């Protein structure tokens, strides 16, 4: 079995993107999306990914937002975060400096999926 270096995004650390790189191509985005464990979707012509999270109560949604914020600071890669309808959070990821998706976005998506609010 051949080892795929992209299989475990959550074990990786985001690396600073200085710009000047090309964004991931559509086929690579599709491949990377398959490696995530949940329902992340590409949009805006495969230049961004997003996912909506739903929680039982507002407090859980707010806790989740705060944990995503801590993760973003630790990784140096910051998603757009929208808390709406009291218990739903939309996370949108892309790398602003290259105007599209980078491996860092998938690393963040994988790590965000591991955040579980307390009951």
Descriptions of predicted regions:
Residues 2-119:
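Long, contiguous binding/interaction regions
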